[in-house]
Amino acid sequence: MATPASITNVTVEFLQFPALVTPPGSTKSYFLGGAGVRGLNIQEEFVKFTGIGVYLEDKAVSSLAAKWKGKSAAELLDSLDFYRDIIKGPFEKLIRGSKLRTLDGREYVRKVSENCVAHMQSVGTYSDEEEKAIEEFRNAFKDQNFPPGSTVFYKQSPTGTLGLSFSKDETIPEHEHAVIDNKPLSEAVLETMIGEIPVSPALKESLATRFHQFFKELEANPNIEN
């Protein structure tokens, strides 16, 4: 793969998100689409909890460019369809969520799963199968505790499997802790991060800015394989 010069590292607080990652035992690298902070306004103060990075399979740029090349970063940022095309795109994604402060696994997954259920209900994809998948999802986190710097990895396949891995740092574990085969849930995880009601507007902005550059570079160098 020829690496576009615009694929660079991103720093979110004290967290470093490298431009490329290769999971253990794999020959496939994923490039950093964007990264940003997730936080909440608590008593008029923005409290930062997590840094989120979205990595994608290399063919994602050319896949998305067919529809989105020529758009400005602002146009991409304002287009929900752009983010939905990332979420539903026919390429693998690896999401890294690293903690900026200590979070209890049960409390963390309670909020994440509530957001996922709310989205699936709003688009009519929440049924008995998704309810079972949410239960699996919650169970995977029940014995976890996340100190600062620790990480949850979500690996998403185009077929709908969601792999979960936990690490005490940014290292990708060799083996996944759990694999859940449910496409609506897998898509909902990323939807809640960068979709219509995102937990990380900063991540959305990073994706728009960086993909605008990726598309420009692809247009200038159409022989780049992404």
UniProtKB/Swiss-Prot annotation:
Site label Important for catalytic activity, positions: 108
Entry EC number(s): 5.5.1.6
InterPro entries: CFI (IPR044164), Chalcone_isomerase (IPR016087), Chalcone_isomerase_3-sand (IPR016088), Chalcone_isomerase_bundle_sf (IPR016089), Chalcone_isomerase_sf (IPR036298)
Record carries keyword Ligase: no
Top-rank taxon: Eukaryota
Binding site for substrate: 50, 115, 192
Enzyme class: isomerase
Pathway annotation from the record: Secondary metabolite biosynthesis; flavonoid biosynthesis
Role summary: Catalyzes the intramolecular cyclization of bicyclic chalcones into tricyclic (S)-flavanones. Responsible for the isomerization of 4,2',4',6'-tetrahydroxychalcone (also termed chalcone) into naringenin.
Protein name: Chalcone--flavanone isomerase 1B-1
Organism the protein comes from: Glycine max
Gene name, Swiss-Prot/TrEMBL: CHI1B1
